[in-house]
């Protein structure tokens, strides 16, 4: 029997889909990239914004048509939307055979077998204690591994559904993570990314309430074949001086931080239940840029959060101008049922104002990007080739500080270190030509 997995959302979802695929292959199922060939279709959903949920609903409808043609087709839905909607999905969509949660992904083999027996069900049991380093996976990349080190989030930002769909923070044992890093190192992997909804909270639940992400990075760096270590996603006020120094001093730690600000207004940050002020955030960015050589910093912002005035928005604009991020992700505020903001804060900023502010920030960031990218012109940079950038024979890779470079190459060099000379800059990627193969 063949299976197909459709993944929406974040890197953690991608990692969990890799795990589900690996477990199903171990059970004797065969993976297919064509849903029309599949006997089992799994949807790994996202609930961060309404748009992501709508994509899931569209997928359910589309695969439901396949089920009309193949009555034996099994359709399962997991991920954050499944955790949020639970049994309602079974009631609303009669073509769904089973629904499962975010903390029992490792039980997917048993869940599929139950579904094959013909009974519809929902299962949201917690199986995180069963997660370990040797769980089978089907990695997308042959050189870059994604490793989830902490599950859940305790922050309860007023707009965010994640604490309700992912649960409380739970860190994996450090020795288990290191054994997983070792397994990838033995396979020749060059890059790893440590994942978590709040990755710099790793280890705080071990007893002393101190983050141990810095120590984890140091231990992972001991493996010779591992050349780059990344981590996503950070919570600004949880970034420690020790972590900054580890990134500054450990040559294998990527000199890149993703620090979601969400707003530049103290009034809005308080309404969002973010645990820092604009002044503290700017101070953190300045500290990172001072301590870590050639570092880049990216961020996230929400436009049109309830009660956001023009003055609040101008404070966000000013923060972006001061911090000069390498990249920003921007989203219009999307009310999420079940969150504090949905219950207690009126969605009072008109849609067209949300979009106008989003477009303004995008144009501002483009100008900043172009100015910041000028220093790379005619410079030689080291990248790892990731794969194709398009259909015209171009490939892409990233520098140690997360600059995206596009160049002509060939598939045989995927996963290899290359030196590329930058000959064109844009507000987005840089363009160049390969100088030589380094390894």
Curated annotation (Swiss-Prot):
[4Fe-4S] cluster 2 binds at residues 153, 157, 160. Binds 2 [4Fe-4S] clusters. One cluster is coordinated with 3 cysteines and an exchangeable S-adenosyl-L-methionine. Residues 139-371 form the Radical SAM core domain. It catalyses: N(6)-dimethylallyladenosine(37) in tRNA + (sulfur carrier)-SH + AH2 + 2 S-adenosyl-L-methionine = 2-methylsulfanyl-N(6)-dimethylallyladenosine(37) in tRNA + (sulfur carrier)-H + 5'-deoxyadenosine + L-methionine + A + S-adenosyl-L-homocysteine + 2 H(+). GO terms for molecular function: 4 iron, 4 sulfur cluster binding; metal ion binding; N6-isopentenyladenosine methylthiotransferase activity. Residues 1-117 form the MTTase N-terminal domain. It is an enzyme of class 2 (transferase). Its EC number is 2.8.4.3. [4Fe-4S] cluster 1 binds at residues 10, 46, 80. Coiled coil: none annotated. SMART domains: Elp3. InterPro entries: Elp3/MiaA/NifB-like_rSAM (IPR006638), Methylthiotransferase (IPR005839), Methylthiotransferase_CS (IPR020612), Methylthiotransferase_N (IPR013848), Methylthiotransferase_N_sf (IPR038135), MiaB_methiolase (IPR006463), rSAM (IPR007197), rSAM_horseshoe (IPR023404). It comes from the Bacteria. It is found in: Cytoplasm. Its main location: cytoplasm. Belongs to the methylthiotransferase family. MiaB subfamily. Catalyzes the methylthiolation of N6-(dimethylallyl)adenosine (i(6)A), leading to the formation of 2-methylthio-N6-(dimethylallyl)adenosine (ms(2)i(6)A) at position 37 in tRNAs that read codons beginning with uridine. This is tRNA-2-methylthio-N(6)-dimethylallyladenosine synthase. It comes from Petrotoga mobilis (strain DSM 10674 / SJ95). The gene is miaB.
């Amino acid at each position: 029997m063949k299976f197909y997995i459709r993944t929406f959302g974040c890197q953690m979802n991608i990692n969990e889909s890799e795990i589900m695929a690996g477990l199903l292959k171990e059970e004797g199922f065969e993976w297919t990239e064509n849903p029309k060939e599949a006997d089992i279709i799994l949807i790994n959903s996202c609930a961060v914004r309404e748009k992501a949920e709508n994509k899931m609903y569209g997928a359910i409808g589309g695969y439901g048509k396949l089920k009309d043609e193949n009555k034996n087709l099994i359709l399962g839905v997991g991920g954050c939307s499944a955790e949020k909607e639970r049994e309602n999905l079974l009631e609303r969509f009669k073509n769904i055979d089973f629904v499962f949660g975010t903390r029992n992904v490792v039980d997917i083999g048993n869940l599929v077998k139950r579904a094959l027996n013909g009974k519809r069900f929902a299962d949201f049991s917690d199986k995180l204690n069963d997660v370990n380093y040797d769980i089978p996976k089907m990695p997308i990349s042959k050189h870059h591994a994604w490793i989830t080190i902490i599950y859940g989030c305790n922050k309860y930002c007023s707009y965010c559904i994640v604490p309700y769909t992912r649960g409380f923070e739970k860190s994996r044992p450090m020795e288990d993570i290191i054994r997983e890093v070792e397994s990838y190192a033995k396979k020749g992997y060059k890059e790893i990314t440590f994942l978590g909804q709040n990755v710099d909270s790793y280890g705080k639940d071990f007893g002393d309430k101190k983050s141990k992400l810095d120590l984890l990075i140091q231990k992972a760096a001991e493996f010779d074949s591992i050349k780059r270590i990344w981590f996503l996603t950070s919570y600004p006020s949880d970034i420690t001086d020790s972590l900054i120094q580890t990134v500054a001093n450990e040559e294998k730690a990527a000199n890149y931080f993703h620090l979601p600000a969400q707003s530049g207004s103290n009034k809005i940050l308080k309404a969002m239940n973010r645990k820092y002020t604009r002044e503290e955030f700017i101070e953190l960015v300045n500290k990172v840029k001072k301590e870590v050589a050639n570092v880049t910093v990216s961020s996230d912002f929400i436009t049109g959060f309830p009660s956001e005035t023009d003055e609040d928005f101008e404070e966000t604009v000013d923060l972006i101008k001061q911090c000069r991020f390498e990249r920003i992700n921007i989203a219009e505020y999307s009310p999420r049922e079940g969150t504090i903001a949905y219950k207690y804060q009126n969605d009072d900023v008109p849609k067209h104002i949300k979009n106008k502010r989003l477009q303004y920030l995008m144009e501002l960031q483009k100008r900043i990007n172009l100015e910041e990218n000028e220093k790379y012109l005619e410079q030689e940079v080291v990248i790892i080739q990731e794969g194709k950038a398009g259909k015209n024979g171009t490939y892409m890779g990233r520098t140690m500080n997360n600059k995206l470079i596009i160049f002509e190459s060939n598939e045989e060099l995927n996963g290899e270190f290359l030196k590329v000379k930058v000959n064109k800059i844009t507000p987005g990627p840089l363009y160049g030509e390969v100088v030589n193969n380094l390894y």
